[in-house]
């Protein structure tokens, strides 16, 4: 054989073989799927024709053979079928041609060499064994193609039909297809001539392979330990030990396929022992991607049926059984131990190289060996996880022997980090070995190559040696991009010559040359093949074939709370970014899109699972614990210990003791605390993982992991805000109890705790949680339908679409509060308490929902925008109620005008009879409702002022100063409306410049209605004759009337000012003063008349003192009246006596003690 063409032949054979292997795999996958293979294969009519066609395969019927009935169904679409089958036919054809060429190459090498030994010539031996393995894989894969006979027969027949000439390769290829029905048996027959060459090559591993697979031996030798000998930390590691470790994965395949194809080499105890050990490591041997073979079944068949004059394998059958048993019972544990060892060493390397990258160059061979071992173990794990062993091995299988690898994620991540680190410092490593070759390696080679050795070598060997030496001497150490392809080709030629039958050198002399050139060969690959080495040892993209177990590992990793696996979860996303570009091949370009789309879906699923896990822990476990701790500070927890000390106190039957503060730290609760810590750790590790990269491109999508988390946290906050505000679900026992939303002060404190939990995420992942919180809260408490700010007519018409916003729940509740709950009998507004209170026994506890504390919480939560929405609903209620009052006024307009003209005359009592008591009471009832709404609005505005003052004091002061620069804009002069609206929105006390109320009441006050609204003071003064005033009582302790009638003062003041300003033609506040004076005058006359009546008469109140006090309170509250305004009609002495009667009268004092503040 001409040694000069050997490198090129190997390169062509191996490259073509790998391409053909991929093409055969594509054909196998396509014809395995009935949905994508050519449609005529599934046609029942044509299937009978196809069976007849291949009945005597590879012999095919002639065209005029009438035995194939219906053959015209195929020929009618001959062109279409030829196009469908052409690629697959020529794939099989190329496989056959490659098989012939590769066998000739191996046979020529075998016949022309004394021995091929890995230790003597790494390059030649590895290439030879790689071709051997490829040979077997291609034969096996072709044998698996389901319809290979039909493909070739139909194509050959249609080729003959269309071109009137036979397809030239069909006859030989057809016989080969028949022969490989049992591919390994055929290969064994063919390889009898290669037994010696294969045996010599595999014998290289007999003494070392088993030792280098035992963990105890590896630890003892410090195989991957870089700091075992600190004094050698900077010295390069380049012995055969590490080099062989780097080839470990390939060596296993060389041994198993080699002994399977060339069983004649199993002639020594050492070879039998090597086979036994290798078989005990696995029960599936990888062929290509997801295809594996049951290696024990194949060897069992071989040992049973192989016949040879030199060896009797039947006597050795027991080793197959022992190895099969070990592969299921012992191998999982051994591989788990190996993974632990490799992971520990990789972690040590990562920490060392990251800190001292200068050590990468001298220790690169150790790193490559570690990466190779890690890759082998990772693929072994996924190939043997959750799979049922083959038939012959299943009987030894016990699922309990399986070892679940909890840290496979960290192993994948460490491999990736180290590969990236080498890429980062690639130039440094290349420089190091380029200088090494041009220096120490050349000197070492020159010492070995003596003149005497060259003289003994002969001219051909000497020429090859000189070529290599001259090339190495011509190296430029500064040329980083130097290619050593020529050197390696020359070394292969020389290695072949040294191993050839005609080589005159002794074996010891040859070893001197090969040992140094093997070393230079290794160094050269570290210069120009570093990327290829990293791809070979660190590329995990073939895990796509095991994507199901791979992503089961991901699912287990993100919920792992025992180690650091969650922090490595992003390695799966990185793999998904690599799959589309590396798994898809040039022979099936459509696959890239299919894989890419699936990777995008998987990436979306992975990020969703990670972020859901984080949010679930934060929003459920941690938040619920923090909220529980917050509840320990509730008032009841302070009262409960005091109640326990009382001897006469007994808890109710259904009483649940409150949580004792600090109880979570008690020893009996340690399990809960440990669980909390574990889940916190899990969530924060996942957050750390999201920080690994800002964004990642997967196929045609760019994923930003942090945005997934940000979106989920925002959704969790929204969900919590919406759910926690809702009232508890009513039960049968609570059906009669009034259901309210959560108290806003409680809700605010709970929300602050929940937000505090979310802020913890900011410590571990680069997300602006503050911005997220502001954005979410603004979204939840802002209605887009609000008009432009700075205008008095901002009220949107109709209903505001708020969907399920938190603001909708709060607004709906306050609408219900204003329209129903505050108007419930037993609920009154207390000026002393600055809020609403409820009488004992009233289901609705107004003091829990309508006091300044709750209003402050409301303003803190919803802000000015939310307050405007609530204020809109309050004003709409006032408008609706005022409209109904207008109807009553219209019906009684004539009587009111007549009474207004004669109220001071004796006939006024006769005129009074024209009014229905129900109308008077209805006016009072509606006015009380309006008063409640106005008081609630005032409380909200006061709270809004406090909130803005606390948060934006300078803005609030600036608005207040601007507002005080002019007199109150009672009549809505346009020049001042801008500042008026700012003052209103800031919560300032605008007094008679309440423009929003005036704007909303304009809708019921047209020019035609002016006369009606002028009668409003008269109507209010007549209401004292109604039944509501008759039954009222003034409660001094709460400064309120028992039936809440005192809120009329707020209603009367605000409505008279508003309608007076709306209907004014002069813009003079004197008009408003006259309106109030008219009310006081008529009311005073009416009340003084009541003094003439007797207790119990129709128009006489039961407690007339309360009516007098009401007028006094009204005068105090009205901004346009003063004390002397009332004294013109009711003497101060009378008012003082009324107060005295209420506060000092014994009977009233007794009654006061019975119906004191505690009843409200």
Swiss-Prot record:
GO cellular component: cell leading edge; cell-cell junction; filopodium tip; pseudopodium; SCAR complex
Superkingdom of the source species: Eukaryota
GO biological process, one term: ruffle assembly
Transmembrane annotation, as ranges: none
Effect of deleting the gene: Cells have defects in motility, and various developmental defects, notably in aggregation and adhesion.
Keywords: Cell adhesion
UniProt similarity note: Belongs to the HEM-1/HEM-2 family.
PANTHER family the UniProt entry points to: MEMBRANE-ASSOCIATED PROTEIN HEM, NCK-ASSOCIATED PROTEIN 1
Subunit-level organization: Part of a Scar/WAVE complex containing brk1, scrA, abiA, pirA and napA.
Described purpose of this protein according to its UniProt entry: Involved in regulation of actin and microtubule organization. Involved in cell adhesion.
Protein name: Nck-associated protein 1 homolog
Organism for this UniProt entry: Dictyostelium discoideum (Social amoeba)
Gene: napA
């Amino acid at each position: 054989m001409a040694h000069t063409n050997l490198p090129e032949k190997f390169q062509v054979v191996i490259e073509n073989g790998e391409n053909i292997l991929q093409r055969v795999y594509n054909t196998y996958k396509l014809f395995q799927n009935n949905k994508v293979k050519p449609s005529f294969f599934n046609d029942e009519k044509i299937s009978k024709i196809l069976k007849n066609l291949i009945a005597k395969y590879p012999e095919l019927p002639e065209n005029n053979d009438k035995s194939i009935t219906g053959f015209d169904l195929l020929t009618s679409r001959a062109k279409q079928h030829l196009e469908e089958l052409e690629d697959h036919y020529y794939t099989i054809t190329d496989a056959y041609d490659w098989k012939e060429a590769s066998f000739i190459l191996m046979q020529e090498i075998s016949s022309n060499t004394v021995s091929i030994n890995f230790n003597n010539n790494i390059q030649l031996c590895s290439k030879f064994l790689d071709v051997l393995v490829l040979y077997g894989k291609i034969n096996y894969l072709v044998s698996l193609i389901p319809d290979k006979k039909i493909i070739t027969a139909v194509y050959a027949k249609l080729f003959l039909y269309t071109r009137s000439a036979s397809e030239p390769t069909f006859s030989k290829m057809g016989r080969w297809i028949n022969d490989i029905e049992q591919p390994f048996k055929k290969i064994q027959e063919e390889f009898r001539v290669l037994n010696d060459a294969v045996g010599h090559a595999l014998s290289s591993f007999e003494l070392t392979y088993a030792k280098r697979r035992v963990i105890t031996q590896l630890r003892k030798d410090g195989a991957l330990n870089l700091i075992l000998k600190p004094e050698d930390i900077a010295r390069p590691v380049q012995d055969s030990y590490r080099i062989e470790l780097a080839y470990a994965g390939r060596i296993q395949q060389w041994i198993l396929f080699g002994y399977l194809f060339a069983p004649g080499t199993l002639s020594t105890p050492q070879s039998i022992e090597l086979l036994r050990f290798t078989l005990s490591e696995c029960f599936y041997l990888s062929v290509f991607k997801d295809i594996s073979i049951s290696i024990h079944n194949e060897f069992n068949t071989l040992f049973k049926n192989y016949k040879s004059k030199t060896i009797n394998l039947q006597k050795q059958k027991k080793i197959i059984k022992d190895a099969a048993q070990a592969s299921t019972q012992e191998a999982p544990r051994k591989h788990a131990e190996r993974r632990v060892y490799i992971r520990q060493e990789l972690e040590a390397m990562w920490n060392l190289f990251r800190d001292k990258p200068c050590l990468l160059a001298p220790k690169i061979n150790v790193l490559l060996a570690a990466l190779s071992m890690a890759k082998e173990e990772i693929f072994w794990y996924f190939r043997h996880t959750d799979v049922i062993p083959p038939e012959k091995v299943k009987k030894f299988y016990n699922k309990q022997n399986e070892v679940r690898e909890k840290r496979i994620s960290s192993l994948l991540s460490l491999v990736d980090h180290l590969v990236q680190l080498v890429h980062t410092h690639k130039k440094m490593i290349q420089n190091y070995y380029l200088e090494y070759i041009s220096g120490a390696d050349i000197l070492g080679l020159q010492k070995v190559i003596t003149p005497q050795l060259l003289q003994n070598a002969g001219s051909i060997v000497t020429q090859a040696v000189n070529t290599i030496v001259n090339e190495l001497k011509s190296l430029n150490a500064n040329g980083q991009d130097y290619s050593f392809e020529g050197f390696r080709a020359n070394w292969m030629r020389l290695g072949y010559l040294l191993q050839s039958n005609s080589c005159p050198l002794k074996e010891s002399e040859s070893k001197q040359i090969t040992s140094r050139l093997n070393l230079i060969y290794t160094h050269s690959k570290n210069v120009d093949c570093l990327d290829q080495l990293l791809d070979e040892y660190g590329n995990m993209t073939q895990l796509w074939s095991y994507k199901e177990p791979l992503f089961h590992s991901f699912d287990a990793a993100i919920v792992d709370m025992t180690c650091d696996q969650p922090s490595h979860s992003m390695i799966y996303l990185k793999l998904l970014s690599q799959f589309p570009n590396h798994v898809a091949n040039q022979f099936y370009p459509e696959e890239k899109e299919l894989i890419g789309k699936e990777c995008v879906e998987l990436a979306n699923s992975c990020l969703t699972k990670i972020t859901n896990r984080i949010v679930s822990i934060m929003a459920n476990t941690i938040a619920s614990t923090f909220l529980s701790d917050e509840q320990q500070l509730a008032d009841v927890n302070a009262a409960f210990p005091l109640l326990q000390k009382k001897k006469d106190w007994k808890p109710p039957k259904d009483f649940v003791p409150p949580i004792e503060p600090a109880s979570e730290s008690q020893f009996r609760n340690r399990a809960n605390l440990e669980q909390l810590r574990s889940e916190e750790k899990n969530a924060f590790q996942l957050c750390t993982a999201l920080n690994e990269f800002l964004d990642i491109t997967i196929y045609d999508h760019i994923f930003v992991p942090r945005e997934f988390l940000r979106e989920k946290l925002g959704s969790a906050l929204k969900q919590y805000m919406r759910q926690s505000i809702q009232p508890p679900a009513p039960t049968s026992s609570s059906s009669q109890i009034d259901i309210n939303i959560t108290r806003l002060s409680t809700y605010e404190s709970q929300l602050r705790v929940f937000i505090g939990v979310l802020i913890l995420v900011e410590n571990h992942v680069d997300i602006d949680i503050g911005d997220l919180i502001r954005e979410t809260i603004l979204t939840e408490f802002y209605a887009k339908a609000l008009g432009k700010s700075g205008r008095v007519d901002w009220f949107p018409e109709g209903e505001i679409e708020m969907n399920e916003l938190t603001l909708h729940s709060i607004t709906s509740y306050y609408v219900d509060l204003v329209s129903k709950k505050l108007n419930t009998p037993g609920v009154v507004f207390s000026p002393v308490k600055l809020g609403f209170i409820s009488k004992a026994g009233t289901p609705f506890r107004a003091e829990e929902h309508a006091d300044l504390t709750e209003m402050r919480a409301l303003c803190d939560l919803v802000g000015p925008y939310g307050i405007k929405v609530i204020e809109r609903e309050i004003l709409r209620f006032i408008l609706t109620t005022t409209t109904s009052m207008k109807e009553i006024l219209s019906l009684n307009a004539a009587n009111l005008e007549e009474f207004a003209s004669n109220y001071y005359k004796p006939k006024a009592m006769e005129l009074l009879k024209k009014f229905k008591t129900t109308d008077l009471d209805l006016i009072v009832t509606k006015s009380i409702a309006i008063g409640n709404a106005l008081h609630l609005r005032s409380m909200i505005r006061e709270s809004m002022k406090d909130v803005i003052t606390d948060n934006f004091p300078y803005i609030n002061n600036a608005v207040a100063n601007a507002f005080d620069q002019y007199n109150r804009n009672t009549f809505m002069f346009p020049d001042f409306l801008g500042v008026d609206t700012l003052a209103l929105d800031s919560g300032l006390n605008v007094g008679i410049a309440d423009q929003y109320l005036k704007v909303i009441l304009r809708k019921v006050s047209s020019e035609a209605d002016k006369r009606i609204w002028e009668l409003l003071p008269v109507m209010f003064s007549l209401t004292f004759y109604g039944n509501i005033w008759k039954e009222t009582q003034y409660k001094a302790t709460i400064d309120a009337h028992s039936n809440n009638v005192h809120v009329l003062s707020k209603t009367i003041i605000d409505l008279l000012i508003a309608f007076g300003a709306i209907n004014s033609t002069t813009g003079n506040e004197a008009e408003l003063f006259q309106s109030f004076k008219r009310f006081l005058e008529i009311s005073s006359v009416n009340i003084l008349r009541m003094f003439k009546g007797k207790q119990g008469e129709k128009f006489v109140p039961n407690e007339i003192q309360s009516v007098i006090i009401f007028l006094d309170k009204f005068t105090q509250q009205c901004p346009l009246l003063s004390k002397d305004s009332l004294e013109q009609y009711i003497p101060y002495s009378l008012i003082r006596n009324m107060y005295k009667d209420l506060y000092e009268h014994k009977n009233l004092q007794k009654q006061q003690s019975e119906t004191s503040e505690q009843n409200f």
